[in-house]
Amino acid sequence: MESWLTSLITQSLTFSILIVGIVSFLESLALVGLLLPGIVFMATLGTFIGNGKLPFYPSWIAGIIGCLLGDWCSYFIGLYFKNWLYSLKFLKKNCHLLDKTKSLLHKHSMITILVGRFIGPTRPLIPMVSGMLKLPLKKFILPSLLGCILWPPIYFFPGIITGITINIPPNPKNDYFKWLLLIIAILIWFGIWLTSKWWKIKKIKNKNNIHFIKRNIGWIALIILSSGIIGLILIQFHPTMIIVRKVFSTIL
């Protein structure tokens, strides 16, 4: 996938920015976004930003535009094609996810739209369900806009760091630093993933074995995430971080 994106991105700057917008649009589009690995695509684009093949700010703007178009198309698809959507096999099989999304939108519409932007399965669903529920536009516009402003750089960030570290001049100290950075990134992402799993299990009541799993996953998630955060703080004192900061400042 990366080689395919590389060949497209090297064609021209305008074409490269267009790709960022298209990827952001498809990631946000109703149902289509469920089929795409958002973190993989956006992190790959972030790698190109990190190694200087893509400019950061034009990519960010393209990401915002693509994201907003995807959100608005999804909203109006839900608004005008509600009955057809209910007849889809996918939504029938995943009616629990649809019902849960509806419940969250009824209780906390603005927070759900904003937070849902950063969660893979709900990103392309929440705008569509908002339309299906005929959520007032004034409640949809602000969280959608804020989410679309924040989402691209956050999802670019792992790739940007990867792109920067790849281009660090090779020497034994730098190779050691790269492995440290990779381990820290894995710990943080795995800790976040485990925390999300723990949060879901936490809501399940009764059953003693569930209580045992819930308690243990919570502790494991806390230990792993804390280790990653501590590692991230400590690595700031590594000499190679000076190079990383300089390269990062040139990108921004």
Curated annotation (Swiss-Prot):
Q: How does it sit in the membrane?
A: Multi-pass membrane protein
Identify the InterPro entries for this entry: DedA-like (IPR032818), VTT_dom (IPR032816)
Keyword GTP-binding tagged: no
Q: Which residues cross the membrane?
A: 5-25, 29-49, 61-81, 141-161, 179-199, 217-237
Q: Does the keyword Cell membrane belong to this entry? A: yes
* Protein's cellular compartments: Cell membrane
Which segment of the chain is annotated as a signal peptide?
Answer: none
One of its Pfam families is: VTT_dom
Query: Which residue windows are coiled coil?
Result: none
Q: Which GO terms describe its cellular component?
A: plasma membrane
Supply the alphabetized keyword list. Answer: Cell membrane, Membrane, Transmembrane, Transmembrane helix
UniProt similarity note = Belongs to the DedA family.
Q: Output this protein's name.
A: Uncharacterized membrane protein BUsg_132
